[in-house]
Structure formats: structure tokens, C-alpha cells
Amino acid sequence: VGSEMCIRDRLKDTVEVMKYYDEWGDGNKYDKDMVDWNYTGPKETTKVFSEFQKNKDAKIYDAGCGTGLVGVELKKHGFKNFHGADLSKKLLELVPNDLYEKLEQVDLNKPINKKDNEYDSVMCVGTFTFGHVKPPALEEFIRITKNDGFICFTINEGIHEEYGFDKKIEQLKEQNKWKEIKFFKSDYIASKDVNAWLGLYQVIK
């Protein structure tokens, strides 16, 4: 999630990212900050996703699920079969009981230990930001998603071009691996003046 000032120079590798979020999760400070900051990413992204993913039994992979904010929104929209993955064990421990079918500690900068076409859709909200998950993860999301499935994500506007997400997104379109459904700038964390690109793409196989 975070802002550039908080984490650009602090998070240099996976271990530091994990430590940062484990510390942020202490005393449930993470969720309190999300409320205080008026973090709208999960709500807005899930609203867009639910407009196109009509099957409420769809098997969904929530990549970078944190404390389950996206899961809460998915449940509100009637979805019930979703799995969560996050790098921070501490944040996973704060996920409400019985919200997800399965929770796993995963480094999304590495190949995801899932079969090809295992999921109907992938959600990734607040994870493409400074010092976090890089563009190659998008190819892994496509790999684990079935044909015609959806990949819905946010990208912090500060890294969209700097990290090469703009080029990766276009490359995947040119390679006919997915097609754009929606892509627009959202407020994300309005109270901190942090915007993000919100994308919804449909997988082609």
C-alpha cells in the first residue's frame, strides 16, 4: 500500500518488506491506519471486479491479501471461494477467521506454487507499490488463471512507469495474453494524495 516517502528507500529486498509489514501489523496498527487514511483500494477494485465476474462460485486468488480487506469486500459481493496469499505472516494472522478458504505465506516475486489454470480470477490490490512486487508477477497471474478469467489489480501511480508496469501491460496485450476491460486512475488513498491505476484484464488462452 504505502506512500513513496514511507518506503521507497527503506525496502530493498524481500526480507525487509516482510519485516516492515510484520512490524506494521503489531497491535493491529495496519488496519487502523487503513481506516484513518481512508484507503478505498479494496472497495473500489472489488466493485469493478464484481461487475464483470458474475459467477459467485468463482475460485479467486487474492495476491497480497494482507489482513483480508479485499476478502471482506468479496464476501459483501457474494463471493465465497477465495484464497489469500501474502508475504507477511503477521498480517495473515490478523485475517478474520473463516474469511478465506485457504491462506498461504507467499513471495509473489517468485513463481507461484499453483497449477496452470487453477483459478477463475486473480485480485491484487495494494501490492504493486514501492519496493514490493514487480511486473513479472502479472505473467504468473495469467498462468494460474483460466481462459476468460479476470485479473484485477492496482498499481501505485508512482511506480507505473518507473518499475516498467506500463511496458509489461502493453507487452501482454501485444502477445494476446489478455485484453483490457478497464484501466483508469483511482483515488486509492485520497487522504495521503496517493493515486493508483486500477486495471481489469481478461485472460486469453
Show the residue positions of the predicted features.
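Conserved alpha-helix/loop element of class I SAM-dependent methyltransferases that forms part
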Residues: 39-57
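Core SAM-dependent methyltransferase catalytic element
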Residues: 188-205
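Class I SAM-dependent methyltransferase Rossmann-like catalytic core
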Residues: 26-40
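Class I SAM-dependent methyltransferase SAM/SAH-binding core
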Residues: 61-111
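A short glycine-rich, Lys/Arg-flanked "PGG" loop and its adjoining helix->strand segment in the class I
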Residues: 136-147
